Design a protein with these regions (language model features):
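Short, highly charge-biased, low-complexity peptide segments
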Residues: 97-105
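Anionic N-terminal interaction surfaces
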Residues: 1-42, 104-106, 110, 118, ...
Length: 123
């Protein structure tokens, strides 16, 4: 099922949950895990995926994507191969469109798959 992605992100490594995510959370929302992206971070909460994208030379301009788990219709995960295929990939089909998430070597695709499964199936 090949469709053009409306967004593509790369998760570089797991990281501590950023302190400055708190103002973005609603009552009852708890952060579960965070990942460093090329330009900022992505945080999985119990309600949604929040991806921050710092822009410009100073990084003061920040675009924030918020993807509620209820909008995810389907997802797939692909683990890395052996020889030349080092990256894993997570794909999300949502009401807004198709989103690709590339995962650098060392990011646990099965942990992410479990996190998405738990969030989507319990939303």
């Amino acid at each position: 099922m090949e469709t053009a992605a409306i967004a593509a992100w790369t998760f570089v490594s797991e990281c501590p949950i950023p302190d400055d995510i708190t103002p973005l959370l609603v009552d009852g929302e708890q952060p579960w895990a965070a990942y460093k992206t090329f330009r900022d971070s992505a945080v999985f909460t119990n309600k949604r995926l929040i991806v921050r994208d710092a822009q410009g030379l100073s990084g003061k301009k920040v675009e924030i994507y918020s993807l509620p788990y209820a909008s995810i219709n389907m997802w797939s995960s692909e683990n890395a191969g052996r020889m030349l295929d080092f990256n894993s990939e997570l794909e999300l089909w949502t009401r807004a469109g198709h989103i690709k998430v590339k995962l650098n070597k060392g990011v646990d695709i099965r942990k992410l798959d479990h996190l998405i499964s738990h969030a989507v199936l319990n939303s």
